[in-house]
Amino acid sequence: MALTLEALAARFGGEIVGDGRCEVGALAPLDQAGPRQLAFLANPKYLAQVETTGAGAVLIAPGDLEKLGAAAHGRNFIVTPNPYAYFARVAQMFIDLAAPPRAAGVHPSATIDPAAQVAASAVIGPHVTVEAGAVIGERAQLDANVFVGRGTRIGDDSHLYPNVAIYHGCTLGPRAIVHSGAVIGSDGFGFAPDFVGEGDARTGAWVKIPQVGGVKVGPDVEIGANTTIDRGAMADTVIDECVKIDNLVQIGHNCRIGAYTVIAGCAGIAGSTTIGKHCMIGGAVGIAGHVTLGDYVIVTAKSGVSKSLPKAGIYTSAFPAVEHGDWNRSAALVRNLDKLRDRIKALETALAAREGDAGGA
């Protein structure tokens, strides 16, 4: 389905420059777009591509349009302060238009406990299991093989993709999106040591601590594929509103993730850690337990966080990749830092002694 630029601007805002009757029915990159496709410029370094693009129209910021000057003549634009966000909203609209909603109802192979409540407008796919006391909200969509444990609540307009497992006693707010393989509400990693003796004479065991809390997920949260969020030991693990979590992320028990925070793939967050609002956690970041990150903290990829970071800012501890020979030389220096320190101290002592002798003379 194609829409005019006028229709897009009426829905999403923005100023039209050029022909508002231009129709676009899809999105494409600047260097690949055709005359019935909409492209966007979010990074000024690609400004030259706007001059050569075949796109029917381009989403562009006011400052970038000014830089184009005469090159903008004869082209169509929607001018908006944030072309990237505009693009995202248009993309979602096109997806919604192309994929008609599935008919409400429960697939014959699904297992719904009589004590569960499933909204008449919900879509329950093949082999879904919904246990007693669970509540499935209006227009929620549960795809094949989803499991919803006893007493769990799934908010209105939520979408659980195939093979998602939501354990008992959890809550997902409205418009939650949970991708395939995610597990919410599994036991936190809690074991009490009960050992006596030393060495080979040591006896005893790790005693499992029952995890009796739950997981509370706020509205408009998205959780990536194969991500795991552990239930709290006593209180709930909490994911606040509009948090976006990538694939393969581990969030330990009793954590609290503040609103609008984003967490990239393969990050690991140990238990009882609090992350503030509007934070950005890079890929493969490791965060120790029982620490607090303040609001607006950014941790770059592969960094290790071992203590609290209360102040807003950008934090890095990862070593970027270098050529192998350079790495070996750097590693050799690190291994010998204690010797270098001792040599410097000895030189400083000798120099101080010389200066003392010279002063005495």
Curated annotation (Swiss-Prot):
Name used for this protein in its record: UDP-3-O-acylglucosamine N-acyltransferase
Keyword Transport in record: no
Entry keyword Mitochondrion: no
Keyword list, A-Z: Acyltransferase, Lipid A biosynthesis, Lipid biosynthesis, Lipid metabolism, Repeat, Transferase
InterPro entries: Hexapep, Hexapep_transf_CS, LpxD, Trimer_LpxA-like_sf, UDP_GlcNAc_AcTrfase_non-rep
Gene Ontology molecular function terms on file: N-acyltransferase activity
Domain of life: Bacteria
Pathway: Bacterial outer membrane biogenesis; LPS lipid A biosynthesis
Taxonomic lineage of the native organism: Bacteria, Pseudomonadati, Pseudomonadota, Betaproteobacteria, Burkholderiales
Protein source organism: Burkholderia pseudomallei (strain K96243)
EC class (word): transferase
